[in-house]
Structure formats: C-alpha cells, structure tokens
Amino acid sequence: MSNHTHHLKFKTLKRAWKASKYFIVGLSCLYKFNLKSLVQTALTTLAMITLTSLVITAIIYISVGNAKAKPTSKPTIQQTQQPQNHTSPFFTEHNYKSTHTSIQGTTLPQLPNTDTTRETTYSHSINETQDRKTKSQSTLPATRKPPINPSGSNPPENHQDHNNSQTLPHVPCSTCEGNPACSSLCQIGPERASSRAPTITLKKTPKPKTTKKPTKTTIHRKTSPEAKPQPKNNTAAPQQGILSSPEHHTNQPTTQIQQHTSI
C-alpha cells in the first residue's frame, strides 16, 4: 500500500510541474503583448504555487526516505534478537537422532559382573591357601634344629626377619608342580632364615628410692687457750681488782667477741 501511494504522489507532482511549465509559457506570451497587470498577477500566483509544490515535494521525499530506511534496520534487529528468543535452527530432530545413534554406536562394552569376579578370585585364593597348608605340613624337614642364640638379645633390625621366617616355613622346590604359590615359598631357603632365637626381655624391677634425711651441721669455733670461762659478776668482789689485774684486762675483749658470734 505504501509503494502505491508514493507512486500516485509522484504522478501528481509530474502533472503539476507540466502545468507550471505551460503557465510560464503563457505568461511570457502575455508579457510580449504589453499586458503588465495581468503578468504581475500571474507571476504572484505562480510563485505561490511553486512554493507550495516545493514544500509538498520536500515532505514527500522525507517520508519516502524514512520508509526506505526502516526495512533495512529491521532485519538487523531481528538477527540480533533471534538467538536469544529461539533455539539455533541447526539443531533439528534429524541431527539429534544422528548424534544419538552415533553415541550409542561408540559406547563402551559392558563390564563383567562384579559379583562373579569376586566369587572366582575368592575361591582361587581359598584353594591356594589350602594347597599351601597341606604341602607345608607334609614336607617339613625332620632334621631341622631350633636356632640357638648365646647372647640372648637380638638387634631390632633382624627381629622382623625372624618373625617372617617363622610364618613362612621352607618347602623344597621338588614338590612344586606348576603351583605359583609353592614356587614363591620354595625360593625362601633355609639360608635366608635367621638363626637367632626370639628375644626374651626381662623387666627390671625398679629400685626403691631412698630419701636422705637432712643432717644437722655443727659449727665448731676455735677458742684461744688463754680465754677461760668467766664467772658471773659477783657483787661482793671489788672493782679495783678487775682493773688492777692485767690478765683480766687482756682477756676481756676476746670474751666479748665470742659472745657476739654465739648470738
């Protein structure tokens, strides 16, 4: 509809332009015949018609340009919005079926049942242990003597080997006929077995702790031979005798020193 209307408008513009041409030719003929008043009126009307026609044509061209620009912008918007609203057209039902069949064709083979594998391995291990017990009981060496250890103590390095030699007795390889368990036992010969007896550790009784009693320290002081014990001051003795005697005068400071030390 829009194209049809634009086509009609374009035809009307052509007709108006042709009519204006004819009108201009007529005005020029009148001007030659010296009809100035008629020419002036005709020119004014022609100017009004041309102005209106130019305005109409400008409006039509602007509308046509907008109409042509809109279809070009719409596909770009649809292309940008199409992946957001719809799924990709490449992933159809046919593609889905083909990929599903290819996945089924490339699946791994089914694994064996775990219960059956466990039963077979368990029965095989039981048979091996029974064969090992019967052969070890029937083929034990009779002349084997227990090892003697004169020292009575083993280092910690060989203690683990001694325990292993006790749990795995020696079996001669001549009795093994296609049995892998027996062949692994016969490789452990009597040379590898340790020749030391098991260690016997004696617990040491703890000694009773003796607590020492604190001893009294006596301090002996040396006394001069001249110093003698003085009797108590007698009230009856006169003081002149004390002052007059030179021995008492010399021994008095020594006795005072002893009294200070004893205090």
Swiss-Prot record:
- Show the ranges annotated as biased composition (Basic residues): 204-222
Where are the annotated segments for Binding to host heparan sulfate?
187-198
What domain of life is recorded for the organism?
Viruses
For the keyword Transcription regulation, the answer is no
Query: Residues at site: Cleavage?
Result: G65, N66
One Pfam family named in its UniProt record = Glycoprotein_G
The record, for InterPro entries, names: G_prot (IPR000925)
Q: What is this protein called?
A: Major surface glycoprotein G
Record organism: Bovine respiratory syncytial virus (strain Wbh)
